[in-house]
Amino acid sequence: MLNILKAFLINLWLIGIIFAAESCPSISPKMVEDTPSIQVKAIFDDIVCSFIDLHSKSDGTLSSTLNLTKKKIIPYIDLEYSTQLALSSYWDQLDARERKVFERDLKSSLIEDYISILASINNWENINVSVSDEYFENENTARVKLTLSLKNSNESASVVLKLVRRDMWKLYDLEYQSISIMSIEEIGYDSKIKRQGIDRVVDNLLKKP
């Protein structure tokens, strides 16, 4: 059940990324106003324009999509902050090397969950995404609402993107109907660590290619 929920949430995140752009070429997030909602729009525009360019060259293969994902999506996610949330109280028990091991595992998990979906998308015209100008900001974190809808349909869904700011605003989670990707990751890691112990989990992650 958790895997189904996680896949559903990541699909929503993915759809938001893929269909948010209105025009290409995009403007770099570094060149626009430093507010959460404008940064979200600029981030998504940059990503989607890159995928449009990829598909215009008829190069939407799994390999090319994977490379573009690593280059254009992952850099906009604050993996360290996401991993800290996913590990909750376990985070403070880890040294710097062990934290990087879990960060790498989370990155791999996110890529594996949506890369095949990214590679299979061919129809770019039927989904609209609206980024709300209003946002909630608290110190160095923010929440921005996205509304997704189908063309020629009254159906829509709203999701909340969560961002954290260090040197720039980056995504760290997505929430839909009070369920978030990182809360599901937290449940998964907590269950695994309680069964195996944190040292064994780290050892197993180190053995992964």
What is each of the regions a protein language model found here?
Residues 91, 108-109, 150, 178-181:
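Solvent-exposed loop/turn segments at secondary-structure junctions
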Residues 104, 112-158, 208-209:
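Surface-exposed, charged secondary-structure patches
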Residues 99, 144, 171:
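Surface-exposed aromatic
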Residues 2-22:
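Classical Sec-dependent N-terminal signal peptides that target proteins to the secretory pathway
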Residues 173-209:
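Low-complexity, intrinsically disordered terminal/linker segments enriched in charged
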